[in-house]
């Protein structure tokens, strides 16, 4: 059955099937704006405006070696072409029509983009590690050294006993004690480790709590920075006569990154590092980054711009002053060594065969030596066999680097060994330093509780990582470690003791307000609290300080100690002297309890009558 519609469609609408189709509606032609010169001026003006806003916000380096520069130029060209579409009255359709328009009306942007693409491709090819493996492996000049003869034993006042996490904890706690600052400011996350007056410290500025607090305090700037002593764990708040106005926490023109970009538009920079000079003036050390292989490969640093954080004054130094500690970042040095370790026998050897291919271990630490800070990291074979074959020490100011052959356990194996000694206390080990103890390569690390506070110290022999010593102070730890080395016939009898000179001692005087005693591992330990103190500040062992049992409340004493005998809670006495005028009474009767199973002897100590 055929169904026919005549005069109306299926929906009931009238139509004439024989009528001719209606012609398409013609598009009304768009008119171009002004003259050709006027259109070019408008297009250029809008492009420059967009470029200025982008440059102010994103701050790309105007440098062919900077990848972001290509994106910036591409944005300018695209902006110009879009403006030209509107100002020229373009009505084309399809990709072909747009392409034809761009070639005719946007000739300059078209050829600029084409040139950029060619330049980027050639630059990437000339930077390709497959073709330039020899150049990549030569980025970091490396000399070999002898551990026993070149690595000197470090005195206690040069060993950093805090890691970054513990320093941050102390910094936050210190700011919380400052009622005039804690409501407006926070501690920044820099915590740069430097050598300051011959001591290892971490320094960090404050930052504004939020945008409102920045608005309220911007005219005065940031009022202070913190110095955390890595040996004594003391935190000092350095208040400035004039606040820091050029930091990473600032906004607009005083923002450090923007300040650098406007002053040095063609420079590429590493992440700025906060340091202070020997006078305590805060600076930002901004290493100048360069690409040395092709256009985009072989990242290296060449000199640095120093920016005064207070005034904003800046100057480029090809050779930075001696007080500067961080020109080459740890990440850069490690990256360059990994290039050396992988490619010194060619690129294809790093994939097939892997003869003598080495890489750095996961993790690194810092060590103060002379006036500089050295990066330490281990070196292992590419197979990852849980053992080190040596380690690197690299000067972060000059990039002078030495490799020391030293086979033994990896840092993480040593950390596991140390944690195993205190597993009942659940302490965590920090990433270790490598020290020379009686010509034995030794891992040194702090043991922290869950609150990130340092409670003990550990030393692990690199060659025989089952030799582990712990102690409440660095001195205790070293003494125990030397005895273990002696028992294992690794050192001679004359190396089993620690040489001490009178200059190694410091002293503190006070009148005894309270004495408590405890028995730890069979030894009588005495804890002293002086007048004016709210907590016990001196700990002494009767085995080392013979006069300790004769002390009484009311005695005025001078306690001698060494830097390495200092913990967060007390100093470890090496000797005590009874000063003139003190009471000379009979020895008190002492009552004590065993604390072999206690983590804190003071909590279990009994007060002496």
Where are these predicted regions, by residue range?
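Soluble extracytoplasmic regions of secretory-pathway and membrane proteins
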Residues: 2-609
């Amino acid at each position: 059955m055929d169904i026919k519609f005549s005069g109306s469609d299926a929906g009931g609408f009238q139509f004439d099937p024989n009528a001719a189709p209606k012609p398409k509606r013609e598009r009304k032609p768009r008119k171009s704006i002004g003259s050709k010169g006027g259109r070019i001026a408008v297009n250029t003006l809008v492009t420059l405006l967009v470029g200025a806003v982008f440059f102010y916000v994103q701050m790309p380096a105007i440098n062919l070696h900077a990848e972001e520069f290509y994106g910036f130029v591409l944005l300018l060209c695209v902006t110009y072409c879009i403006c030209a579409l509107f100002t020229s009255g373009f009505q084309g359709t399809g990709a072909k029509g747009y392409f034809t328009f761009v070639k005719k009306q946007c000739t300059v942007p078209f050829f600029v983009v084409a040139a950029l693409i060619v330049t980027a491709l050639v630059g990437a090819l000339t930077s390709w590690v497959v073709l330039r493996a020899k150049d990549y492996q030569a980025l970091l000049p490396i000399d070999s050294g002898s551990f026993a003869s070149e690595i000197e034993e470090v005195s206690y006042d040069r060993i950093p006993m805090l890691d970054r996490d513990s320093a941050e904890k102390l910094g936050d706690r210190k700011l919380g004690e400052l009622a005039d600052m804690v409501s407006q400011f926070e501690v920044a996350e820099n915590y740069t480790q430097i050598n300051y007056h011959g001591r290892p410290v971490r320094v960090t500025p404050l930052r504004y709590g939020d945008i409102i607090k920045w608005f309220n305090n911007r005219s005065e700037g940031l009022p202070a920075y913190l110095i955390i002593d890595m040996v004594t764990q003391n935190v000092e708040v350095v208040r400035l006569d004039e606040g820091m106005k050029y930091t990473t926490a600032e906004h607009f023109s005083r923002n450090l990154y923007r300040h650098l970009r406007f002053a040095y538009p063609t420079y590429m920079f590493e992440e700025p590092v906060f340091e202070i000079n020997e006078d305590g003036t805060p600076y930002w050390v901004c290493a100048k980054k360069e690409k040395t292989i092709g256009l985009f490969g072989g990242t290296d640093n060449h000199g640095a711009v120093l920016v005064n954080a207070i005034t904003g004054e800046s100057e480029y130094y090809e050779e930075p002053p001696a007080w500067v500690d961080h020109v080459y970042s740890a990440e850069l040095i490690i990256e360059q060594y990994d290039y050396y370790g992988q490619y010194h026998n060619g690129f294809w050897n790093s994939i097939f065969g892997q003869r003598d291919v080495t890489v750095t271990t996961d993790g690194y630490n810092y060590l103060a030596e002379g006036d500089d800070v050295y990066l330490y990291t281990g070196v292992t074979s590419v197979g990852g066999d849980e053992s080190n074959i040596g380690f690197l020490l690299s000067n972060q100011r000059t990039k002078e680097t030495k490799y020391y052959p030293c086979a033994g356990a990896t840092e993480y194996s040593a950390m596991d060994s140390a944690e195993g000694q205190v597993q009942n206390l659940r302490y965590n080990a920090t990433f270790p330093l490598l020290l020379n103890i009686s010509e034995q390569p030794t891992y040194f690390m702090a043991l922290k509780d869950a609150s990130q506070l340092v409670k003990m110290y550990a030393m692990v022999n690199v060659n025989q990582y089952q030799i582990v010593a712990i102690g409440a102070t660095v001195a205790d730890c070293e003494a125990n470690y030397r005895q273990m080395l002696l028992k294992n016939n690794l050192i001679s009898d004359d190396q089993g003791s620690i040489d001490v000179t009178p200059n190694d001692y410091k002293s503190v005087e006070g009148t005894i307000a309270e004495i408590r005693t405890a028995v730890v591992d069979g030894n009588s330990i005495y804890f002293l609290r002086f007048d004016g103190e709210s907590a016990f500040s001196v700990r002494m062992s009767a085995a080392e300080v013979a006069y300790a049992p004769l002390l009484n409340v009311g005695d005025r004493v001078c306690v001698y100690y060494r830097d390495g005998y200092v913990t967060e809670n007390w100093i470890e006495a090496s000797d005590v002297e009874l000063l003139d005028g003190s009471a000379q009474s009979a020895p008190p009767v002492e009552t004590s309890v065993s604390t072999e199973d206690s983590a804190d002897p003071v909590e279990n100590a009994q007060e002496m009558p």
